[in-house]
Design a protein with these regions (language model features):
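Transmembrane-helix bundle of Major Facilitator Superfamily
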Residues: 2-164
């Protein structure tokens, strides 16, 4: 059910669709958390890595620039090679890049890792949204699903800074 379109909206298939949507929403939540959690930590990062204000702006913006620049590209890649496959590869890359942040010793390395995180987010976002859309039939259910996943993403943006 995770990646297939439901052929009917029976109570069981709807329940499975909402469970799958919860998983896809968790992916989106972590992407948005990853995007917003950094901002509170920037002063500490600047001190620890002896980074200039300009370098810290690159730390913050490299993720968004790469993410925005590649999202349409990876949407097309996901259409060609499979949304689930590309999304899962993006999740693996996001996990590895997140782990790599522990080992950075310079601001340049951190910018590179944040850029990799942007690539990973560009891989996961189009697929997760497309898969969420395909879980449901009928405009009403699709609107509810898109509202749910979008709201979860906004929660991630909102709670990221306090968690940072």
């Amino acid at each position: 059910v995770f990646v297939s379109t439901l052929t009917r909206n029976s109570p069981r298939s709807l329940r499975e669709a909402w469970i799958a949507l919860a998983g896809l929403s968790a992916v989106f939540l972590f992407e948005m958390l990853d995007n917003s959690i950094l901002n509170v930590a920037l002063p500490t990062i600047g001190r620890d890595l002896h980074a200039s204000t300009t370098a810290l702006q690159w730390v913050s913006n490299s993720y968004a620039v790469v993410f925005g620049g590649l999202m349409l590209v990876f949407g097309a890649v996901a259409d060609r090679f499979g949304r689930r496959r590309v999304m899962l590869a993006g999740l693996v890359l996001l996990g590895l890049a997140s782990l790599a942040t522990v080992f950075v010793t310079s601001v340049g390395e951190l910018i590179a890792v944040r850029s990799l995180m942007g690539v990973a987010a560009a891989m996961t976002t189009p697929g997760s949204i497309a898969l969420a859309f395909r879980l449901f039939q009928g405009d009403d259910l699709r609107v509810r699903a898109m509202t749910f996943i979008s709201t979860v993403g906004l929660v991630g943006l909102a709670v990221g800074p306090p968690l940072g």
